[in-house]
Amino acid sequence: MERRLVPRSAELMSQQDTVLLVIDIQEKLIGKIENAKRLVWNVRRLLDGAGELGLKILATEQYPKGLGPMLSELAEGIPQIPSKMMFSCRGCPETIEQIAGCGAHKVLLCGIETHVCVQQTAFDLMASGYRVYLAADAVGSRFRMDHELALQRMESSGVTVTTTEAALFEWCEVAGTPEFKRISRIVREPSPTSFADD
């Protein structure tokens, strides 16, 4: 008799239903962000994992004339990075249209600053009916209190707060596959020793 698996929880992200949205990680702002090196490392891992698994990857820039472009080490492979003046990514209609167009109903956010562009985007996406996830180790603010209170506010309002590693394994779902081997390599990547300098 064949055993049937129970259905997968709707709480979990998958390769098929999730978009990765990278918010405003720009040259002239990142150096002011607490734990910036760790944040960039985790965003790089999310980008690598999403690329390996075929997730849709989107990114934005906030006022690049003043804040500079997206970090080049993260921008590689992202074909279009629209700019905005509005803090929320709803200020980039093309980005919202791409999320809607790919059929995803979950969005994982990473980027800066937690309490401004990330938080406002999270609430606007929720208001539009999306399930919003946040990689807490891949977002940041200049000041710790702003970051921590924004995480609390978003979580209490229904945003699912997670981590980079948890997200990668959720997307992967099962072990013993070629995809799992690629994700495992990303997860096992040693963290830079320079984190102590943050």
Name each model feature, range by range:
Residues 27-32:
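Short acidic, Gly/Ser-rich segments with clustered Asp/Glu that frequently serve as metal-coordination loops
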